[in-house]
A protein has these predicted regions:
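Cyclic nucleotide-binding regulatory module and flanking cytosolic helices
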Residues: 1-37, 88-90, 121
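Cyclic-nucleotide recognition modules
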Residues: 74-131
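Short phosphate-coordinating micro-motif centered on Lys-Gly-acidic
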Residues: 41-46
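Short, Lys/Arg-enriched, Trp-marked, Pro/Gly-tolerant hinge/linker segments that flank
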Residues: 140-152
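Glycine- and acidic-residue-biased ligand/ion/polar-headgroup-sensing regions
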Residues: 38, 49-64, 80-81
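A generic structural signal for short hydrophobic patches within well-formed alpha-helices
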Residues: 23, 115-116, 218
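Phosphate-/nucleic-acid-contacting segments
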Residues: 150-155, 160-223
Length: 223
């Protein structure tokens, strides 16, 4: 039996210190939005008024290289239960990144106004907010560390292992261009890295289907 929106929110760090009564009100204020692949939820620079929780599918959080070109760097991949778009609630700033569906997806759109109303009457909610922000900082620290200490081949190995979700055989859930954005390199350099894994016998590839043959060696290359 699928979880209710209220139950889904309760499992998220942001709402870890939120009372059941407040969760019920926040969930009731949410609106379900259905998205097709490529649909943009919001763009970088827009004025925000809501946060989102992924109900199904995958959402990419990315920053662009405009006006120089159309390349993007994917900062995060949001999946079922993940919350994003909360920063504007805390600092009233514009969106710092864009959010786009990578496949047919649905999200729960939660107005900031509903969350702010509960924060005023239940300030202990801030403990959950702090917990989520701390986890965000840890992720950004890891991304920064990867960019400094791992080359493109190492970052490609790491992203493939993450996208495999622990399975040796998997279908890549993103395009080659999107994978390049996650790695922070050109598509050509990422393809060369993948080709090197295949040549070494660590990986097999058929279109978007992959089979990891030497997970330990891939893991060592990504650390």
């Amino acid at each position: 039996m699928p979880m209710t929106h209220e139950e889904l929110l309760a499992k998220n760090a942001f709402f870890a210190a939120t009372s059941p009564a407040s969760l019920k009100k926040i969930a009731a204020a949410g609106i379900v939005r259905s998205l097709q692949r490529g649909d943009v939820l919001f763009n970088e620079g827009e004025v925000p008024d809501a946060m989102f929780v992924v109900l199904s599918g995958r959402i990419a959080i990315a920053i662009g290289n405009r006006p120089l070109d159309s390349r993007e760097s994917m900062l995060a991949l949001m999946e079922g239960g993940d919350l994003f778009g909360e920063l504007g609630l805390l600092d009233d700033g514009a969106r710092s990144a864009l959010a786009r569906a990578l496949e047919p997806s649905s999200v729960l759109q939660i107005p900031y106004s509903a969350v702010k109303a509960e924060l005023q009457s239940n300030p202990t909610m801030l403990w959950g907010v702090t917990k989520l922000l701390a986890s965000r900082l840890r992720v950004m620290d890891e991304v920064l560390s990867d960019s400094v200490f791992l080359d493109v081949t190492g970052r490609t190995a790491k992203r493939l292992l993450e996208l495999s979700d622990g399975n040796d055989e998997f279908v890549l859930p993103v395009t080659q261009e999107e994978l390049a954005g996650m790695v922070g390199a050109s598509r050509e350099r990422v393809n060369k890295a993948i080709a090197s894994f295949i040549r070494l016998g660590w990986l097999e590839q058929s279109d978007r289907r992959y089979r990891i043959k030497e997970r330990s060696k891939m893991s060592a290359r990504s650390s």
